[in-house]
């Protein structure tokens, strides 16, 4: 994790690209108390990469539902953007954000090697005295004993996307988001990835997403528990205590994040804005797909990764 300073009043593409290079190497970049006008956040992310979840930016900053955009909006050529909100706040008895309350355990946006492998969160309102935690697998890999590295080398996991294991989502929000989720999901939610990973900047770490259903192929007895016990140590975890305006950017290939359980009233006041974007997957063919192709047979590649 590294702290970074940006002047959003004079933000340039060069500032964005410098931040992007920092993110590739450090995996977690924290910008404290940035302006809460989402225009700056959107310009930063679009200047670094491209906004992947533009079709899920369906609210204005007051929580009014605006409908699903038909095309992405260039934040550099407008003075107003729509947002994706993370909040339990309701308006007219309707949800105004995703992941509203309850459990949000260790997870990543990278639910498959084709996905956007970057996430940005900004504290918009009511975030004081709340925490989000990030697990840095590169730090864990650096500290890993050679004996464990030898056990995970050439091992891959088969994953099945299972949001119910890591998030509590009320049924009414599930229904509201069903059409959007279907547009964003792959036809088949089963995917494979090597445990050892390396991002586009050459940073080595792990992809070990324990809260999706997973099977380690050719597993040695006890490897799952041994790796999980080593990985989720406090010394590899960064706890971010939110202030209004804070932006946290993170690499989703080599980190996981979670929020602790809090009373519903806390999340009914708390509003985060969320953007997803590619980091290693900015290239074509996508970098992470190419790195994990050898987990698949030729026939499977023809089906999944055309």
Short names for language-model regions:
Residues 2-246, 253-306:
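Non-heme Fe(II) oxygenase catalytic core, chiefly the N-lobe of the double-stranded beta-helix
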């Amino acid at each position: 994790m590294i702290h970074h300073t940006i002047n959003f009043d004079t933000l340039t593409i060069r500032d964005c690209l410098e931040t992007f290079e920092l993110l590739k190497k450090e995996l977690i970049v924290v910008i404290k108390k940035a302006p809460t006008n989402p225009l700056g956040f959107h310009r930063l992310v679009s200047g670094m990469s491209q906004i992947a979840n533009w079709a899920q930016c369906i609210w204005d900053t007051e929580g009014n539902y605006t409908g699903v955009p038909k095309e992405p909006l260039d934040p550099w050529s407008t003075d107003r953007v729509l947002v994706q909100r993370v909040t339990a706040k309701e308006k007219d008895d309707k949800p105004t954000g995703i992941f509203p309350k309850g459990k949000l355990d260790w997870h990543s946006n990278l639910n498959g090697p084709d996905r956007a492998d970057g996430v940005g969160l900004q504290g918009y309102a009511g975030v004081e005295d709340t925490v989000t935690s990030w697990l840095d697998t590169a730090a864990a890999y650096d500290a890993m004993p050679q004996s464990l590295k030898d056990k995970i080398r050439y091992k891959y996991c088969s994953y099945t996307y299972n949001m119910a294991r890591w998030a509590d989502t009320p049924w009414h929000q599930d229904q509201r988001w069903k059409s959007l989720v279907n547009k964003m999901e792959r036809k088949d939610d089963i995917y494979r990835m090597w445990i050892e990973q390396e991002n586009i900047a050459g940073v080595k770490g792990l992809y070990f997403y324990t809260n999706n259903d997973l099977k380690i192929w050719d597993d040695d007895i006890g490897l799952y528990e041994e790796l999980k016990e080593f990985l989720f140590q406090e010394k590899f975890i960064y706890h971010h205590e939110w202030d209004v305006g804070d932006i946290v950017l993170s690499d989703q290939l080599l980190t996981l994040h979670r929020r602790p359980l809090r009373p519903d009233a806390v999340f009914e006041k708390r509003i985060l804005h969320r953007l997803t974007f590619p980091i290693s997957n900015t290239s074509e063919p996508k970098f992470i797909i190419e790195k994990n192709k050898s987990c698949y047979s030729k026939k499977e590649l023809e089906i999944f990764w055309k």
